[in-house]
Amino acid sequence: DWFYKDGGASLFWPEKWKEFVETIPKNEQSNIIKAYHKRLFHKSKEIREKFSIFWLKWENSLASMQKSINNYTPPINYALAFSRIENHYFFNKGFLGSDDYILSNAKKIDKIPGIIIQGRYDMVCPPNSANKLKNVWPKSELKIIDFSGHAMSEPEISRELIKATEKFKN
């Protein structure tokens, strides 16, 4: 709801949200994931490609604090693969039973240690989501990374991911 409905991330990037939704008919804008699914899996290659770029531009606009990433237009093959895979999962609610499935089932991993790495300025997955997970996963450690967004390419996020991997490699 935060990322694909008006009133969440769209409040921070209204001009990018407008670009993302304006090509979708008004009567379909209440369910952007479904509307994009229809177009990303359309029989017309031209329509699939056009909407895969729109999808990725919205994602990239909010994924990083680095301007170079925000203005990047990827190769069409990447845009198609990324947007279709991501949309397919979202369209199918991540193949989970409910929106709160992970939080409701955290007890299944409560004895397993883990590190949650979260950008302070993540506009894709807001920090309160990571905090909610930390609150139900006692063996987890939450690292909020200041001056970072969502993307793995953010320098501090990358560093923390490597440190976390090193910690658990043995």
Describe each PLM feature range:
Residues 107-111, 136-137:
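Short, conserved loop/helix-junction motifs that constitute active-site signature segments
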Residues 70-80:
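Small-residue-rich helix-loop
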Residues 109-110, 116-118, 122:
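Short beta-strand/loop motif that positions the catalytic acidic residue
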Residues 34-70:
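Accessory cap/linker subdomain of secreted extracellular hydrolases
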Residues 123-129:
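Conserved alpha/beta-hydrolase "acid-adjacent" motif
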Residues 1-36:
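A catalytic-pocket lid/entrance helix-loop region that shapes and gates access to the active site
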Residues 88-106:
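Active-site nucleophile elbow and catalytic-triad environment of alpha/beta-hydrolase enzymes
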Residues 140-170:
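Catalytic active-site module of serine/aspartate enzymes centered on a nucleophile-bearing elbow/loop
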